[in-house]
Amino acid sequence: MTEHKSGFVSIIGRPNVGKSTFMNRVIGHKIAIMSDKAQTTRNKIQGVMTRNDAQIIFLDTPGIHKPKHKLGDYMMRVAKNTLSEIDAIMFMVNVNEEIGRGDEYIMEMLKNVKTPVFLVLNKIDLVHPDALMPRIEQYQKYMNFTEIVPISALEGLNVDHFIDVLKTYLPEGPKYYPDDQISDHPEQFVVSEIIREKILHLTSEEIPHAIGVNVDRMIKENDERVRVEATIYVERDSQKGIVIGKGGKKLKEVGKRARHDIEMLLGSKVYLELWVKVQKDWRNKVNFIRQMGYIEDQD
């Protein structure tokens, strides 16, 4: 009889290499926020992948960057602290881009860890196969990797193969979570991330990092409908106008798109009510950051 494998795996990489796309691909639900804006993951989101022979808990860490404010400091601490808690590390890179200073910074950080490190070259659907080996050789000059696997998280190419390879390095162990549990975050947090994702998709470059979303109330009104009330926080009045849009059109579209995904998540009809409020310089206010759900790990 095959032994059951279970373990915790950290997905690390510089911003926008496809970490959240990978997470959502293997879990099969939208757990991690996806956007073309950098630094969209603010918390280590645990996604639980359960198969007959294994259960893998993925930690989607914030993209590595130089912090510019207290929220950025917290994002970096989350990323680094995660490395000490896990059984394997996925270092994900964009195979379509040259090795950047961010990649070098991460590899310097990973050189001395004793945990198995997998180099996962994502977005192979965007490059010619002949370009793959030269890129792999470039990374091998920096450090030795446990395994090197090219994938496309968006298209699903080679993802199952990578999971099979990863499982061989995980310890034998029990299921930590029930079969139907896909995340350890409360539903309110995932709902707030869905709303934030839609805002990122619909707003300009000025807005993304100044956006915070808090679910104020989420109640089941009856067997068929859940009521969700959420507040969108921005840092300036001008940003509030951008999020609301002319005649409220932008906010209405955010609500429409978010409601669709929230209904998929909850398996129920959703009544979604959104407000937009200005909270000046909120990313530098520790208590407010904590209130938003970005809670620092206790020693």
From Swiss-Prot:
Sites where the protein binds GTP: 13-20, 60-64, 122-125
Domain Era-type G: 5-172
Region described as G2: spans on this chain: 39-43
Chief localisation class: cytoplasm
InterPro entries (UniProt xref): G_ERA_dom, GTP-bd, GTPase_Era-like, KH_dom-like_a/b, KH_dom_type_2, KH_sf_prok-type, P-loop_NTPase, Small_GTP-bd
Topology term for the membrane: Peripheral membrane protein
UniProt-listed GO biological process terms: ribosomal small subunit assembly
Annotated segments matching region G1: 13-20
GO cellular component, one term: cytosol
Localization terms from the record: Cytoplasm; Cell membrane
Renumbered residue ranges of the record's region G5: 151-153
Keywords: Cell membrane, Cytoplasm, GTP-binding, Membrane, Nucleotide-binding, Ribosome biogenesis, RNA-binding, rRNA-binding
Region (G4): 122-125
Renumbered residue ranges of the record's region G3: 60-63
GO MF annotations, alphabetized: GTP binding; GTPase activity; ribosomal small subunit binding; small ribosomal subunit rRNA binding
A Pfam family the protein falls into: MMR_HSR1
Domain of life: Bacteria
Record domain KH type-2: where: 203-280
Subunit structure of this chain's protein: Monomer.
Family under the similarity heading: Belongs to the TRAFAC class TrmE-Era-EngA-EngB-Septin-like GTPase superfamily. Era GTPase family.
Function text: An essential GTPase that binds both GDP and GTP, with rapid nucleotide exchange. Plays a role in 16S rRNA processing and 30S ribosomal subunit biogenesis and possibly also in cell cycle regulation and energy metabolism.
Protein name, as recorded: GTPase Era
UniProt organism field: Staphylococcus haemolyticus (strain JCSC1435)
